[in-house]
Protein backbone atom coordinates (compact mmCIF):
# COMPACT_ATOMS: atom_id res chain seq x y z
CA UNK A 1 0.00 0.00 0.00
CA UNK A 2 2.97 2.32 0.45
CA UNK A 3 3.50 2.46 -3.32
CA UNK A 4 -0.16 3.30 -3.88
CA UNK A 5 0.09 6.16 -1.40
CA UNK A 6 3.35 7.34 -2.99
CA UNK A 7 1.74 7.48 -6.44
CA UNK A 8 -1.37 9.13 -5.01
CA UNK A 9 0.73 11.95 -3.56
CA UNK A 10 2.93 12.26 -6.64
CA UNK A 11 -0.10 12.54 -8.95
CA UNK A 12 -2.12 14.59 -6.46
CA UNK A 13 -5.03 12.15 -6.60
CA UNK A 14 -7.97 11.86 -4.28
CA UNK A 15 -8.56 8.13 -3.93
CA UNK A 16 -10.64 5.88 -1.73
CA UNK A 17 -9.38 2.44 -0.83
CA UNK A 18 -11.52 -0.66 -0.56
CA UNK A 19 -10.24 -4.08 0.36
CA UNK A 20 -11.60 -7.46 -0.66
CA UNK A 21 -10.30 -10.98 -0.07
CA UNK A 22 -10.89 -12.22 -3.62
CA UNK A 23 -7.52 -13.98 -3.95
CA UNK A 24 -8.35 -16.09 -0.90
CA UNK A 25 -11.76 -16.95 -2.38
CA UNK A 26 -10.33 -18.33 -5.64
CA UNK A 27 -7.20 -20.01 -4.26
CA UNK A 28 -7.30 -23.71 -5.10
CA UNK A 29 -9.98 -23.35 -7.79
CA UNK A 30 -9.55 -25.25 -11.07
CA UNK A 31 -9.70 -22.04 -13.14
CA UNK A 32 -8.69 -19.32 -10.66
CA UNK A 33 -7.81 -16.64 -13.24
CA UNK A 34 -11.25 -16.58 -14.86
CA UNK A 35 -13.08 -16.68 -11.52
CA UNK A 36 -10.82 -14.02 -10.00
CA UNK A 37 -11.35 -11.67 -12.96
CA UNK A 38 -15.13 -12.09 -12.69
CA UNK A 39 -15.15 -11.53 -8.92
CA UNK A 40 -12.85 -8.47 -9.12
CA UNK A 41 -14.97 -6.92 -11.86
CA UNK A 42 -18.16 -7.63 -9.89
CA UNK A 43 -16.65 -5.98 -6.80
CA UNK A 44 -15.70 -2.92 -8.88
CA UNK A 45 -19.18 -2.66 -10.40
CA UNK A 46 -20.82 -2.99 -6.98
CA UNK A 47 -18.62 -0.33 -5.42
CA UNK A 48 -19.04 1.99 -8.43
CA UNK A 49 -22.82 1.72 -8.22
CA UNK A 50 -22.70 2.28 -4.46
CA UNK A 51 -20.71 5.48 -5.11
CA UNK A 52 -23.17 6.66 -7.79
CA UNK A 53 -20.82 6.07 -10.73
CA UNK A 54 -21.87 4.76 -14.13
CA UNK A 55 -18.48 3.55 -15.41
CA UNK A 56 -15.51 1.54 -14.29
CA UNK A 57 -12.16 1.98 -16.03
CA UNK A 58 -9.77 -0.94 -16.24
CA UNK A 59 -6.07 -0.76 -17.07
CA UNK A 60 -5.96 -3.35 -19.84
CA UNK A 61 -3.53 -2.33 -22.57
CA UNK A 62 -2.66 -3.44 -26.11
CA UNK A 63 -0.52 -6.36 -24.96
CA UNK A 64 -3.29 -7.63 -22.64
CA UNK A 65 -5.71 -7.55 -25.58
CA UNK A 66 -3.58 -9.62 -27.95
CA UNK A 67 -2.69 -12.07 -25.16
CA UNK A 68 -6.42 -12.53 -24.55
CA UNK A 69 -7.09 -13.09 -28.26
CA UNK A 70 -4.48 -15.86 -28.36
CA UNK A 71 -5.75 -17.43 -25.13
CA UNK A 72 -9.26 -17.57 -26.59
CA UNK A 73 -7.99 -19.14 -29.82
CA UNK A 74 -5.66 -21.67 -28.22
CA UNK A 75 -7.51 -22.65 -25.04
CA UNK A 76 -11.18 -22.07 -25.94
CA UNK A 77 -11.18 -22.61 -29.70
CA UNK A 78 -12.97 -19.33 -30.37
CA UNK A 79 -12.04 -16.03 -31.94
CA UNK A 80 -12.95 -13.17 -29.65
CA UNK A 81 -11.33 -10.16 -28.12
CA UNK A 82 -11.67 -7.91 -25.13
CA UNK A 83 -13.60 -4.78 -26.15
CA UNK A 84 -12.43 -1.22 -25.39
CA UNK A 85 -15.91 -0.27 -24.19
CA UNK A 86 -18.93 -2.33 -23.26
CA UNK A 87 -22.17 -2.15 -21.35
CA UNK A 88 -22.50 -4.40 -18.34
CA UNK A 89 -24.94 -7.27 -18.71
CA UNK A 90 -25.32 -7.71 -14.93
CA UNK A 91 -25.29 -4.11 -13.68
CA UNK A 92 -27.91 -1.77 -15.14
CA UNK A 93 -26.66 1.49 -16.63
CA UNK A 94 -23.04 0.54 -15.95
CA UNK A 95 -20.31 0.63 -18.54
CA UNK A 96 -16.75 -0.68 -18.61
CA UNK A 97 -14.04 1.28 -20.42
CA UNK A 98 -10.41 0.45 -21.14
CA UNK A 99 -8.70 3.80 -21.84
CA UNK A 100 -5.27 2.17 -22.36
CA UNK A 101 -6.56 -0.29 -24.98
CA UNK A 102 -4.20 0.87 -27.74
CA UNK A 103 -1.24 1.72 -25.50
CA UNK A 104 1.71 -0.69 -25.49
CA UNK A 105 2.86 -2.12 -22.15
CA UNK A 106 6.42 -0.95 -22.83
CA UNK A 107 5.15 2.62 -23.27
CA UNK A 108 3.31 2.47 -19.95
CA UNK A 109 6.50 1.21 -18.28
CA UNK A 110 8.53 4.02 -19.91
CA UNK A 111 5.97 6.60 -18.78
CA UNK A 112 6.11 5.30 -15.21
CA UNK A 113 9.91 5.34 -15.14
CA UNK A 114 10.08 8.83 -16.63
CA UNK A 115 7.59 10.15 -14.07
CA UNK A 116 9.07 8.18 -11.15
CA UNK A 117 5.85 6.24 -10.59
CA UNK A 118 5.99 2.83 -8.96
CA UNK A 119 3.27 0.26 -9.19
CA UNK A 120 2.62 -2.80 -7.10
CA UNK A 121 2.91 -6.26 -8.57
CA UNK A 122 -0.22 -8.31 -8.85
CA UNK A 123 -1.03 -10.12 -5.61
CA UNK A 124 -2.11 -13.18 -7.59
CA UNK A 125 -0.20 -16.35 -6.70
CA UNK A 126 -0.43 -17.63 -10.31
CA UNK A 127 1.11 -14.42 -11.66
CA UNK A 128 3.82 -14.40 -8.99
CA UNK A 129 4.86 -17.94 -9.91
CA UNK A 130 5.02 -17.01 -13.60
CA UNK A 131 2.99 -20.10 -14.48
CA UNK A 132 -0.23 -18.58 -15.77
CA UNK A 133 -1.53 -18.81 -19.32
CA UNK A 134 -1.14 -15.06 -19.81
CA UNK A 135 2.62 -15.34 -19.15
CA UNK A 136 2.82 -18.16 -21.69
CA UNK A 137 0.97 -16.03 -24.25
CA UNK A 138 3.31 -13.10 -23.56
CA UNK A 139 6.28 -15.40 -24.23
CA UNK A 140 4.63 -16.78 -27.38
CA UNK A 141 3.99 -13.28 -28.74
CA UNK A 142 7.62 -12.33 -28.07
CA UNK A 143 8.75 -15.42 -29.98
CA UNK A 144 6.36 -14.68 -32.87
CA UNK A 145 7.70 -11.11 -33.05
CA UNK A 146 11.27 -12.44 -33.20
CA UNK A 147 10.39 -14.49 -36.29
CA UNK A 148 7.72 -12.29 -37.84
CA UNK A 149 8.14 -8.56 -37.37
CA UNK A 150 4.80 -6.97 -36.53
CA UNK A 151 3.06 -10.23 -35.59
CA UNK A 152 1.60 -8.56 -32.49
CA UNK A 153 0.09 -5.72 -34.54
CA UNK A 154 -1.34 -8.20 -37.05
CA UNK A 155 -3.03 -10.14 -34.25
CA UNK A 156 -4.78 -6.92 -33.25
CA UNK A 157 -5.49 -5.97 -36.88
CA UNK A 158 -7.18 -9.34 -37.40
CA UNK A 159 -9.96 -8.19 -35.06
CA UNK A 160 -10.82 -5.47 -37.60
CA UNK A 161 -10.40 -7.62 -40.69
CA UNK A 162 -12.71 -10.59 -40.16
CA UNK A 163 -14.01 -11.92 -43.46
CA UNK A 164 -17.31 -13.51 -42.46
CA UNK A 165 -17.56 -15.33 -45.80
CA UNK A 166 -14.56 -17.43 -44.77
CA UNK A 167 -15.88 -18.36 -41.32
CA UNK A 168 -17.37 -21.85 -41.34
CA UNK A 169 -20.29 -21.04 -39.03
CA UNK A 170 -21.49 -18.32 -41.41
CA UNK A 171 -21.83 -20.65 -44.40
CA UNK A 172 -24.41 -23.40 -44.89
CA UNK A 173 -22.68 -26.37 -46.48
CA UNK A 174 -25.04 -28.93 -47.99
CA UNK A 175 -22.61 -31.79 -47.40
CA UNK A 176 -22.22 -31.04 -43.68
CA UNK A 177 -25.36 -31.85 -41.70
CA UNK A 178 -23.93 -31.09 -38.27
CA UNK A 179 -20.95 -28.99 -37.25
CA UNK A 180 -17.70 -30.91 -36.92
CA UNK A 181 -15.77 -30.15 -33.77
CA UNK A 182 -12.28 -31.58 -33.54
CA UNK A 183 -11.44 -33.14 -30.20
What are these regions (language model features)?
Residues 29, 33, 37, 59, ...:
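Alpha-helix initiation/capping motif
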